[in-house]
Amino acid sequence: KMLDKLIKKLQTHSGIESKKDIQSAAKTFSHNPFSELGKSAMIGDDAAVIPKQSGLLLMASEGISPSLVEKEPWFAGWSSVLVNISDIVAMGGKPLALVNSIWSDKSDLEKHNQILSGMSFACEKFNVPMVGGHSNQKSPYSALSVSILGLVDGPVLSSRFAEAEDELWIIVNKDGCYYKDYPFRDAATKASATLLR
């Protein structure tokens, strides 16, 4: 009964509900753009696998929740880098570089600068460079998207290869706390760069 309650709660969690938004993209694009790479290159994982002669490139992108960008611009900037790095590492890769797209209202330069500051802080802490991007300060709203390129030299850690009886490892920093009223923990902004890297 307890497990059933947990499953039901997770199924209606805002983080899970928002995954439904991926369906239109999944219906539009090829599910296996690099078929020669097999299951590891199928879309829907934490990062895209792109063929390269020595090792494989990983690519990922995250759009940040508009309400987070609006209410917490610095933390949105920080999070945009963190979630991208997490996606690359989750697939066994090393982050190489990031790019961003920021849309904001020119009358709110402070918000724009806070987003940049949050991204810059995360880039320094994780030692991953922001190598370019796009800014538009003539928008009636604020929006943020960040993309990352990574490299994997060993096996790709893809959920497609999971099997019954596999061990599941969860690596967690138990320090930190929930961030304000949001349903996620912040265990990284105050952690040392050495621990995070």
Each predicted region: which residue ranges?
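Helix-biased detector of long, well-ordered alpha-helical tracts
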Residues: 1-197
